[in-house]
Amino acid sequence: MCGDVQMTGNVTLTTAAAGAVLIVENGQLDTNGFTLQTTGGSGLTMLFSGSSGSYTHAPTGGGTLDFAAPTSGTWSGVALYQDPSLVTGVNISAAGNSPTWKITGLVYLPHSSVTLSGAVNKSSNGKSCFVMVMDDITINGTGDILENGGCAAAGLNMPTASVPSGGKLVN
């Protein structure tokens, strides 16, 4: 799709496990308060592309995104992807008393400032796997770090590293 897209009702997609790729070029996906979801066993990668400029390259609109990334194929494990060549119009804010982002998989927003306010959970039909790559993040209200042990089953192979014994977290 080229340009801004505004939803006028709830949308449910059914795809193969290898998933579908929804590309929005030089525009935003305005959920307009509605829900974009996939059925169980379906996979979706939402990709924002185009040229930097006066465009918003992100989901907006206060609705709900409820989908899992594909579990196989080229976009395996990738749920939301912003083209890394985009450097403007990439910031994202999601808020709500219930999760507005119910996403399973990798959310890749390499140049985004992300603000989340009570807005994230796993997909209704997905595994426990939510991984974000972003420039910086602000979490308002209650924030929680969830165990990501479901990432391999969700099609996302996480990198591993060995930690020497005696390591600790410091403030």
Predicted regions and their residues:
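Long, polar low-complexity repeats
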Residues: 1-147
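Protruding loop/beta-arch "assembly-hinge" segments enriched in small, turn-prone residues
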Residues: 147-171
